[in-house]
Amino acid sequence: LTTVISYFALVAFALVGVSYATPKASINGRIVGGEMTDISLIPYQVSVQTAISSYGFIHHCGGSIISPRWVVTAAHCAQKTNSAYQVYTGSSNKVEGGQAYRVKTIINHPLYDEETTDYDVALLELAEPIVMNYKTAAIELAEVGEEVETDAMAIVSGWGDTKNFGEEPNMLRSAEVPIFDQELCAYLNANHGVVTERMICAGYLAGGRDSCQGDSGGPLAVDGKLVGIVSWGVGCAQSNFPGVYGI
């Protein structure tokens, strides 16, 4: 069993009183082996975009809607000032057809460690509430202490690379991956990073399906609940290296 305990506490803290009226260079925040999907099937998925001089905003990371004004993503995706980011919602295409929202406040987990990527979670408060519809909806959070069974099937989604250093797709993709045994994951990744109690692993031992560069911060969902945030991994969809997700 894998226990989900960490980032939900931060979320609960940040949302008190709220009314609804870059990991290490050798480890890449990371959909390989998946398929194109429609945003209406994953309406909580957003593109966290960053400003690039005169080019405007471009896709930077994924994120998940947890309320009309709040998005959760990875801390390593949110290390600049709030004005450097916008959240793009409601479209399967990360460059058109959606709605952009300015970021008002960034709350990184106070214990986030850039070297180990521990506590890799951040909250983005939006300047205006997201207009909710069939293409934009909040995802339910797994409860603190809730357990996720090893081998339970999860959905990971995003606009990241479709292969190592491959072309980044404009269209949203998703892949189904099993929750991976925590102890074995820690052993397999021991020479590349530490798998802590604030992390959960997902993927196939043989590889073939995984999140990839550009998917960081995006959702890992089991039975419609958010159980992880794309954080780091060795390459993408490589055998013996399941993806690692912040919890």
Swiss-Prot record:
**Which residues would be cut away as propeptide?**
22-30
**The protein, known as:** Trypsin
Which EC number applies? 3.4.21.4
Query: Where are the disulfide bridges?
Result: 61-77, 185-201, 212-236
Please provide, alphabetically and separated by semicolons, the GO molecular function terms listed in this UniProt record. serine-type endopeptidase activity
Catalyses: Preferential cleavage: Arg-|-Xaa, Lys-|-Xaa
Locate the active site. Answer: 76, 120, 216
Keywords, alphabetical: Disulfide bond, Hydrolase, Protease, Secreted, Serine protease, Signal, Zymogen
Q: Subcellular location, in the record's words? A: Secreted, Extracellular space
Where, by tissue, is this protein expressed? Midgut.
Q: Where is the Peptidase S1 domain?
A: 31-247
Q: Does the keyword ATP-binding apply?
A: no
| Signal peptide feature range | 1-21
Q: Which PROSITE patterns does the UniProt entry name for this protein?
A: TRYPSIN_DOM, TRYPSIN_HIS, TRYPSIN_SER
Write down the species: Simulium vittatum (Striped black fly)
> The organism sits in which domain of life?
Eukaryota
* Entry similarity comment: Belongs to the peptidase S1 family.
Q: Which Gene Ontology cellular component terms are annotated?
A: extracellular region
Q: Where is this site: Required for specificity?
A: 210
A biological process (GO) annotation for this entry? proteolysis
Give the InterPro entries listed for this entry.
Answer: Peptidase_S1_PA (IPR009003), Peptidase_S1_PA_chymotrypsin (IPR043504), Peptidase_S1A (IPR001314), Trypsin_dom (IPR001254), TRYPSIN_HIS (IPR018114), TRYPSIN_SER (IPR033116)
Q: Which PANTHER family does the record match to this protein?
A: ACROSIN-RELATED, HYALIN
